A protein has these predicted regions:
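Catalytic-core signature of thiol
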Residues: 1-180
Length: 181
């Protein structure tokens, strides 16, 4: 993946917009472990709407966000509103949330961005919800129990700023001992 990134950026870490990279992954895919992987599509998510962000993460899993990284965040586990200068752009994955904010994966660690910082346009510049076959696998069901047709419809809703109705799947029913053996 790193080689492909450097091929795209001209051999150095010159950066790229997330949407440009997602377009390449949608059209060509990326090579990992000797296999090519593509995404079906993606939509931009309005990160200033907290409930929409939560829905995107719940339905589509980890979502890429573009950050204008302030220097204070390079040394802290909690990323909050700050007046420190921007050191550069950074692409991370938002992978969960709680009452305080969103959890992001970066530099091999998990950090928390407070809701005040996350929903601001000062530090975030882009957020996307991608849909990939790796998310729903060959059974066409996501880890959250949604079928691929619902995922495609919900992707369009999220992109339009609409929070889809999220009905949790029924819990699995265990087979009683002695039955089905």
């Amino acid at each position: 993946v790193k080689k492909q990134y450097f091929d795209y950026t001209g051999g150095a870490d010159n950066g790229a917009s997330i949407s440009e990279v997602l377009d390449i992954i949608r059209s060509k895919g990326f090579l990992a472990g000797g296999k090519w992987y593509k995404i079906d599509g993606y939509v931009a998510v309005d990160w200033t709407k907290k409930e929409l962000v939560k829905a995107a993460i719940l339905i589509f899993g980890a979502c890429p966000i573009g950050i204008d990284l302030p220097s204070a965040w390079t040394n802290d586990a909690i990323w909050d509103v700050t007046n420190t200068g921007i050191v550069g752009g950074h692409d991370v994955r938002v992978c969960g949330w709680n009452e305080q904010g969103c959890f992001v994966s970066s530099w091999g660690r998990i950090y928390l961005i407070t809701w005040a910082a996350f929903t601001s346009k000062k530090w975030l510049s882009e957020m996307y919800a991608p849909l990939a076959p790796l998310w729903y696998n060959s059974d066409k069901i996501s880890p959250t129990g949604m079928d691929v047709e619902t995922l495609i419809a919900d992707l369009q809703k999220i992109g339009g700023g609409i929070i889809p109705d999220i009905t949790p799947p029924p819990p699995p029913v265990p087979t009683p001992a002695g039955l089905g053996e």
